[in-house]
């Protein structure tokens, strides 16, 4: 709810800055009060959105809820479904008043998030644009597939389908689509059961072992960039 944070406006780095670039500011980094002081500084503000929080009352992902497009209230993520003056409504109104202080350029990391942000009543009148996250092509480039398979103890023959996310069982990452598509593929092409495998990386990847009609090779969570390159 952004009620605690650190006042950065007194820092030399802030005073010397020509532009202020915000990213993810939650969990005690910046409060709405701190953000207000930043906006009052008169410095140009760019805010890169890594989720929906800047454009909603309190949620980081609105899922099916569209209240943020008009005004947050009766939040489905609050116990009992919230009410007209619930936490989401109060924070929404605070943000709406706060954003009037200065123009903000909101940058999203995907076109999907750009569309969501542009539909928010909070960001009306502000610039919203999309700049996808860059990829280090010196690191992430094609490698020897056979060596990679050997490294992860994967079959040298056959096709491998790759699926990964921070948490495999998070429905927002498409796990249901993966299961459904694999079942459909096995139904229409049963011969693939002996030549296709599914490589999964991310937390709880082991849980997919018995949910797919193909062999599953679970690599668990991967944090090392060089390991990701090999995958």
Tell me the role of every PLM-derived stretch.
Residues 189-229:
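Nucleotide-activated donor-binding/catalytic signature segment of Leloir-type glycosyltransferases, i.e.
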């Amino acid at each position: 709810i952004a009620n605690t944070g650190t006042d950065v406006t007194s820092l030399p780095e802030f005073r010397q800055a020509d532009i202020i670039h915000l990213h993810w500011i939650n969990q005690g980094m910046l409060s709405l009060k701190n953000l207000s002081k930043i906006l009052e500084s008169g410095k140009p503000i760019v805010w890169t959105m890594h989720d929906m929080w800047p454009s909603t009352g309190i949620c980081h992902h609105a899922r099916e809820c569209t209240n943020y497009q008009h005004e947050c209230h009766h939040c489905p993520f609050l116990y009992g479904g919230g009410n007209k003056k619930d936490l989401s409504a109060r924070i929404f109104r605070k943000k709406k008043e706060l954003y009037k202080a200065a123009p903000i350029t909101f940058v999203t990391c995907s076109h999907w998030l750009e569309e969501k942000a542009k539909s928010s009543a909070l960001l009306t009148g502000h610039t919203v644009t999309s700049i996808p996250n860059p990829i280090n092509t010196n690191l992430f480039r094609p490698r020897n597939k056979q060596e990679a398979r050997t490294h992860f103890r994967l079959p040298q023959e056959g096709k491998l389908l790759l699926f990964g996310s921070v948490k495999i069982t998070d429905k927002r990452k498409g796990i249901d689509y993966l299961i459904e598509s694999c079942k459909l593929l096995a139904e229409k092409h049963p011969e693939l059961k002996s030549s296709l495998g599914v490589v999964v990386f991310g937390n709880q990847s082991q849980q997919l072992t018995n949910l797919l009609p193909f062999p599953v090779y679970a690599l668990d969570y991967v944090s090392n960039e060089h390991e990701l390159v090999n995958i």
